A protein has these predicted regions:
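Glycine-rich, low-complexity intrinsically disordered segments
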Residues: 1-150
Length: 150
């Protein structure tokens, strides 16, 4: 039987974002068109072995500046929705997920493009994006059905 009072989840960052963005810049975010650095803590650097074989990555990060949440929110493109039907940073578990393009790796420093996160944002995990697992036929994207080539 599930008992939420007994379960505690503790996540530790594996690194952080460096990109010079400190304040929100509107929608669409210009962050996505600028390179960002992900600095991986030295004790995790060996985990980057063979990561450069992947063109795209999924970055899981913490919305560390978000304070509180509402179960319904107004989104810029989709109107009012439940928080789980949105990309809002104001969530019960403040985790973000973005697919980014890997531009380069130098020691423990990744350069990526497409990361919509502030400078100093804690990175919780990095995973290779694998298209055959990421694409789904008939998935709705921004309210429209798109067909996958996978």
């Amino acid at each position: 039987m599930y008992n939420s009072k007994r379960i505690k989840i503790a996540l530790s960052p594996i690194g952080f974002v460096r990109n010079g963005f400190y304040v929100p810049c509107g929608e669409p975010s210009p962050f996505r068109n600028k390179p960002s650095k992900i600095i991986v803590f030295p004790k995790y650097a060996a985990g980057l072995y063979r990561l450069k074989e992947h063109k795209y990555l999924d970055i899981i990060f913490c919305f560390h500046r978000s304070k509180g949440y509402k179960l319904r929110c107004k989104t810029p493109h989709w109107g009012v929705r439940g928080v789980f039907a949105s990309r809002s940073p104001y969530r019960p578990s403040p985790l973000g997920l973005m697919k980014v393009r890997l531009l380069s790796i130098r020691k423990n420093e990744l350069t990526v493009k497409g990361l919509d996160a502030f400078d100093g944002t804690p990175v919780v995990d990095i995973k290779p994006y694998v298209a055959k697992w990421g694409r789904k036929k008939g998935v709705k994207h921004h309210g429209k059905t798109k067909r996958s080539k996978a």
